Amino acid sequence: MTSRQQAILSAIVEQYAEVASPVGSSLMAKLFHVSSATIRAEMAELERLGYIMQPHTSAGRVPTDKGYRFYVNNLAESEPALLVEGRAERALAARVQHAGAPERMIRNAVDTLVELTHNLGLATIGNQLYISGLSNLFGQPEFIGGVNVKQVAQLLDNLEPWLREAAPNEPLSVYIGQENPVGRAAGCSLIISRFRSPFSDRSYIGTLGPTRQSYRDVMNLVSRAGQELEEVLYV
């Protein structure tokens, strides 16, 4: 993939996350200051490679799971140490530090993630899975009319046992669409951060949202939540 194709793919991912509608060549042409014909040729190649696709009802393009994975991998490589700054970081820290009991700290961190990301938030507390913001998830355009609701419910039912058995060891893990080990058909991305707590050396906090989301912002927030909880709880 050329550097321009990478930039176009990133722009499609970010634009689609913002507007929730397929991205057309005319908008990309304005962003990159080239002709629409040039953009159409580049998008055709990205589609041939499997990074974007054309919905049946639109002339625009949307990212595929493969496209999202390429984008997320690039984020991790180019911005490995990004931290959330400003108001969001302060909100997370305040909600955690002023909560009192460890369980309340974790719940507050999840609730704050829900408010900041507009996704479903979750965390393990011992052998329990705390979930908040289900209405956020089902309020997204991808799930209107009950689409994939059963698959999402199955994912949530099986998530805590899977986390306990698989015990992902990375500080931050991102499972996109079909990569989800317990909900491949749900059309969701699971972003989780591992942290140490009084309940377990492998506790997890994160979000579940549609594959269409602002990965940079959500990954930073989830990573920061895990760091904050470990700093406060694991002493």
Protein language model annotation of sequence segments:
Residues 4, 63, 221:
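Short acidic-hydrophobic sequence patches enriched in Asp/Glu that either
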Residues 5-9:
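Short, leucine-enriched amphipathic alpha-helices that occur as contiguous helical runs
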Residues 11-18, 22-74:
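N-terminal helix-turn-helix
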Residues 69, 76-235:
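Intrinsically disordered, acidic Ser/Thr/Pro-rich low-complexity regulatory segments
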